[in-house]
Amino acid sequence: MRKELEAIISKGYNSYRVFEDWVGLMFFAFQRDDPHYLEIMGRYRNKGPMGQREADHFANALACLLEYMAATNEEVLGPLYEEYAANHYTGQYFTPLNVARLMAGICQTPPSEGTFTVLDPACGAGACLIAA
């Protein structure tokens, strides 16, 4: 997926816009909403040999996503969002999953019967909760 999205970004497109458009294209494709799908695709040049056009890269990224989701139980869109659409574009910063897992491991206490404790210091996207 990253390779395909990076191929589009490398042509001078904004990473935030590419990610947002990719999600929109997937949604409108599954809904069979051609007018909205074509509206998004109209933002891209789509020139070049078959397999190297922006539309080809978007389609290949979807194929990679579906293959990845079929092969693993890992969450993938959240980390991609954090990489391409968040940070300096939106002012959103997320706790990296490896840091959240470390924090969850340090903070875990033996559970009391019927009692659960949740510690998510930023109360943002829930990375610490997911890691626990």
Please provide the spans of the model-predicted regions.
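Class I S-adenosyl-L-methionine
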Residues: 1-122, 128-131
